[in-house]
Amino acid sequence: MNRSVLALPAPPSTARRLTGVCALLLVAALLSLPWADIQLYRVDPWQELSRMGAGLLLPAWDDLPLLLQSLGQTVAFALLAVALAAPLGLTLAMLFHWRAVRLFCASVRAVHELFWGLIFMQLYGLGPLTGLLAILVPFTGVFAKVFAEIFEQQPPEPGRTLAPSLGGLRRYAYTLIPQAWPALTSYTRYRFECALRSSAILGFIGLPTLGFHLETAFKQGDYHEAGALLWAFVVLIATIRFWMRPRLLLLWLPLALWLLPPQVGFSNGGYLWQFLSVDIWPQPVRNGDWSGALSWYVDLFSTQVWPGLVQTLLLTQIALLLTAVVTLAAYPLASRALAGPVMRWPGRFLLLVLRSTPEMVLAFLFLLLFGPSGLPAVLALALHNGGLIAFLVANASDAEFNSPRQRPDDPTGLKRYAYIETPRRFPALLAFLFYRWEVILRESAIMGILGIATLGFFIDSAFEEIRYDRAFLLIICTAVLNMAVDTVSRRLRRATQIEPAQPYRTATTTME
């Protein structure tokens, strides 16, 4: 036997790779703790917490037509934006082999919907076009990326039967799109749920969606009305599969157009050129004073960009690790193999509430309880994303519960959790965690609108002061940071080989 073959080093095991990834996440979070602004202020939350609990247990809303209108406008923004973004994303996905298209899609999806809303508000005021574009633009980039990855996963054999002279568009029409159609439609339904959450939180910047009334109720201390709004939104998310069916789209789309709110304030699309050519550039640049421009950029970077960027990244890393902890603790509550029939449905309901409630709303609640620091943001991000990933992991566990892999002598309870279910689910759990890393970073940045010292705080302040040059640079820095994290996440997934077999089909199980 050839000794050189025997001398070859053994490839690293899956357990070793996963252990290394977990160690990296743990070290990054621990190193972030001393520098992150997560101090607990001296507050007495128990009285406020009891009032919130009473509001959730006894929801009340006197103006039912206003509640229905708010829900309808939330759905209208989400539905119309997805109806436009999905075909646009599909078109870009067919051109995704071009570097310029990939860069464009990465840049538009790296900016949060609320930041897009603040930008378009300067052009179109508090009108329907602002809300639609705020969701449509980043969602188009997301659809393009995901649809392109779905196409890459399709088997190549059907395409080989076509004539070599057939153009690329026909190849997509005759092979790739029909092959990928179930995954494309399933992911589109999943993005619609995400669009509902995005539409709701657009109310935090003044649009008349659910978030506007929710923020007002919380600020006024009317927790019974806030509870009614939260429960209404949870029911809306939970019943999507009943009222959002393909055959009903011809009814919902015209109704959504009719439900859009009227224009409030100005709407000046002709201002776009001045906004792009003048307003977003600092005065020294417009005057050709390059020395003054350098001084302006250095000052802004040292006083706003760097502090905001550091806090955004630190909170992201802590929230990422805590998300993994929440997932590991929560998925057994909804797993048929671990929870049993009595605990499973309450567990699934808990995860439904966590994944349905936007991070912004959870952070707003925690701010009232713990004061203005990064702690509310970390808790909100971990609970929402942990609830979402736990739901996915529990669904994967349920799918295998009656499979041939199960044996009559398999252990139960804690032993099954530790030795069977968690080892089997852990690679997919990490893969979903890395998929959400980019999202957690975007949400960490936007938490600044609530007063937390992330990049969003400085962006919101710049818009309030009508300093569009500062806001533009800060948004660019946010996008660059987001693209960098997305690149690191993608490379880690590939290096550790922890891609789930069918990530997009699995993700859509949140709709079921």
Each PLM stretch: what is its role?
Residues 1-79, 83, 87-91, 95, ...:
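N-terminal, non-cleaved signal-anchor transmembrane helix
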Residues 30-40, 118-125, 135, 190-193, ...:
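A structural signal for multi-pass alpha-helical bundles of membrane permease subunits
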Residues 47-54, 206-216, 271, 451-462:
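Short hydrophobic, aromatic-rich alpha-helical segments embedded in or entering the lipid bilayer
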Residues 69-77, 109-142, 303-319, 355-390:
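Loop-to-helix entry region at the N-terminal start of transmembrane alpha-helices
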Residues 78, 82-90, 94, 114, ...:
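Hydrophobic positions within alpha-helical transmembrane segments of bacterial inner-membrane proteins
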Residues 88-120, 149, 329-366, 391, ...:
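Cytoplasmic-entry segments and transmembrane alpha-helices of multi-pass inner-membrane transporters
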Residues 128-191, 195-198, 373-436, 487-490:
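Membrane-cytosol interface at the C-terminal ends of specific transmembrane alpha-helices
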Residues 210-245, 455-491:
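Hydrophobic alpha-helical transmembrane segments of polytopic membrane proteins
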